[in-house]
Amino acid sequence: METKLFSSASLIKPSGTSLLILLTVVLFLLMTLFQWLLTSSLEGIYAVILPVSVSAIACGLLGFGVIPLLRWLKTGQFVREDGPQSHLKKAGTPTMGGIFFIPVAVGVALIGSKFDPQVVAVGIVTLAYMMIGWVDDWQVLRQKSNKGISPKMKLLLQIAVAVLFCLWMLWTGSPNITNLSLPGNLIIPLGWLFWILAIFVLVAESNATNITDGVDGLASGTCAIAFLGLAAIVAPTSVGLMIFCACLSGGCLGFVLHNRNPAKVFMGDTGSLALGGALAAVGLLSGNLWGLFIISGIFFVESLSVIAQVSYYKATKGPDGQGKRLLKMAPLHHHLELSGWSETQIVGVFYLINAGLAILGFISR
């Protein structure tokens, strides 16, 4: 008898609208908690609520105009046939949604921070990764398949952006930028190894959020929470980066309005690569890699599930060329789907887990 891992029998099945409300409440409670922990009062909480709200409203409203345009341009998603069968009905849903909420969120951040040089830098990185994703999405649409630009080309472009950002940090950063700060006031001087780590973090984080973007509202909602957690972490040292993270969090919330189940639009690589690049850029520039690692727990687990699945399959491959699988399907959210969880159950649980990780990342900063 097959063991049912992660049985969903006792879990409710929330609607997409319920999850949007849950996400909004979670973000508000996190903003209140972080403000209290930082200042022991709620005075000044508007400094975070305002950029989150402005960005969310702007992106949410813009979506009502852009989504019909994307549909008219025939940017319908091509769904992989070897994926969950329940996803086949998603074919034709407009993709490349990142093209409207990413630039708006970055623009609001630039204005709100009065074009702080650090915000300009991470904004450029974000838009650069967005363009890499857009090229990939565009190739998918042109070829009418689920394959965009080659993995090698995508990786080279991601590395190129990472290298340029690292060169900028090397040119403008403090002498201590290559130190890795860990909990307990432990500081590890990495020297030149920091730059290798920085490039890896930028590429890995952008791909991790990309892998997570496989269920309606999953990547956008978890990123909204992650950005808010990162905003609280960087607030004591950089108001500009705090505003940037708050705006990206709001942008994701505005996008969830349209991306909640059943999704009216997907962010595509255009959005997911940009979000990961933005998280990594802020974490590196602010010297908060440990906090970034904690709040990105969902993304890394999703990535590790793919790595483990592929590695185990290759390691157990027999004479017939077939191997064994650890999961029913990778990444993890697809395994949960095939184990009986609904999309909304997965998203709701992941939201709550990521909220806990955001708090943990803030406390252990």
Curated annotation (Swiss-Prot):
Q: State one Pfam family annotation.
A: MraY_sig1
Q: What is its EC number?
A: 2.7.8.13
Keyword Transferase listed: yes
Tell me where in or outside the cell this protein is found: Cell inner membrane
Query: What GO molecular function annotations does the UniProt record carry, in alphabetical order?
Result: metal ion binding; phospho-N-acetylmuramoyl-pentapeptide-transferase activity; UDP-N-acetylmuramoyl-L-alanyl-D-glutamyl-meso-2,6-diaminopimelyl-D-alanyl-D-alanine:undecaprenyl-phosphate transferase activity
Q: Which reaction does it catalyse?
A: UDP-N-acetyl-alpha-D-muramoyl-L-alanyl-gamma-D-glutamyl-meso-2,6-diaminopimeloyl-D-alanyl-D-alanine + di-trans,octa-cis-undecaprenyl phosphate = di-trans,octa-cis-undecaprenyl diphospho-N-acetyl-alpha-D-muramoyl-L-alanyl-D-glutamyl-meso-2,6-diaminopimeloyl-D-alanyl-D-alanine + UMP
Q: Which parts of the chain span the membrane according to its record?
A: 19-39, 47-67, 91-111, 115-135, 155-175, 184-204, 224-244, 281-301, 344-364
UniProt cofactor(s): Mg(2+)
- Similarity field: Belongs to the glycosyltransferase 4 family. MraY subfamily.
Role played: Catalyzes the initial step of the lipid cycle reactions in the biosynthesis of the cell wall peptidoglycan: transfers peptidoglycan precursor phospho-MurNAc-pentapeptide from UDP-MurNAc-pentapeptide onto the lipid carrier undecaprenyl phosphate, yielding undecaprenyl-pyrophosphoryl-MurNAc-pentapeptide, known as lipid I.
Question: This protein is called what?
Answer: Phospho-N-acetylmuramoyl-pentapeptide-transferase
Q: Which organism is it from?
A: Gloeothece citriformis (strain PCC 7424) (Cyanothece sp. (strain PCC 7424))
Underlying gene: mraY
